[in-house]
Amino acid sequence: MKKYIVICFLFLSFYSKASFVLLPMEAEGQKNHLKAYGITYWALEKQYKVSWLLNFRGGSFLLPDTDEVRKECQIRGVTFEVFSDSKMNAILEEISSPSQNMETVVLEKAPKIAVYTPKGKQPWDDAVTMVLTYAEIPYTEIYDEEVLSDQLILYDWLHLHHEDFTGQYGKFFGAYRNAPWYIEQKRDAENLAKRLGYNKVSEEKLAVASKIRDYVIGGGFMFAMCSATDSFDIALTAEGIDICEPMFDGDESDANYQALIDYRNSFAFKDFNLERNPMVYEFSDIDTTNDRQKGIIKMEQDYFSLMDFSAKWDPIPTMLCQNHTQLVKGFMGQTTAFASDKIKSSVLLLGENKINGEARYIHGTKGKGMFTFYGGHDPEDYQHRVGDAPTVLDLHPNSPGYRLILNNVLFPAARKKKLKT
């Protein structure tokens, strides 16, 4: 009987001292930062209580200590540490101290994720689908039919990537107008627009952009990268205006369309000038890609700094900036970064390069919802070109640039707190 009591005591003592699993997220403490987000999402799906410890050891995640959680971490190669109640309570008390720029944010549910992408695209065709697949975070692919039939309300989070909402087919005409893939994509877009009841691709894409705008205003979260950022705003500001040259839509553009642009309709950008030349691979002067092509910004100098926010007063931008480094290497895309003087004052700069006069990572609110724009195509492929092989994320499990994407994936799971900035 005494032996039985001792065994029970030891068993209970062990679990009283080991009731939390911490996924450390600092630079040296985590073998696979990206898959740690996948573990956190998985735990939310399992309805475990999960917390995000902002600014604590790189933005660590706190989960309950169960055999299932430990096993899943081991299977996915994610570093974890086990803490007793007393030790974790001391840490949480330290985090809550007014003198510490840290905060505990409760994650309530696994957000339903939609990725806006044409049918038949592979996961490596954009950085978000690639990292979601790698992190084992489930998502649903949707495209114009689903958006126009009001299916966005089924999702908490929407991602847009290598898209052109202006109807100019990515401005690839100058370099690729005779390429089979360009001809096929143009034909497919025209057929889709006709099937959905539109005379032009530009009109159909504006309708899609308007539905997405309404989704955000109604409380949705939108995350856009690469050309989906500026082309989205351009489409909204050019509503009712023909900005497409004949090779794109079969008729002349409005002669004075620049003067007709209504910047009030945009989410993030102001006072931009559109690129009228169809041979130029650029939408407007929002984008700063040309500074790299001209050699003004060299690859070895291409970095951006993440801003520092008050975790207790500004938990939203703090969540979006969680990382194990404050300096993140840059990467090019069709839209690489945003000229600082073209960004509205109501928009928060999350990551910028002041010397270059550009922001890479920005965030704002629209109605009841929020949006985040992130310039560039692939955080681990500096100059991704058409036809390049996909990035192998097993070689970049600790990528700071990809972490920023995954911050946005988990962000809608957080218990809502009012932004005070």
Name these PLM-found stretches.
Residues 206, 214-217, 229, 233-276, ...:
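Serine-dependent carboxylesterase/thioesterase catalytic core
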Residues 21-31, 61-71, 121-229, 234-238:
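Helical hinge/lid and interdomain linker segments adjacent to catalytic or ligand-binding clefts
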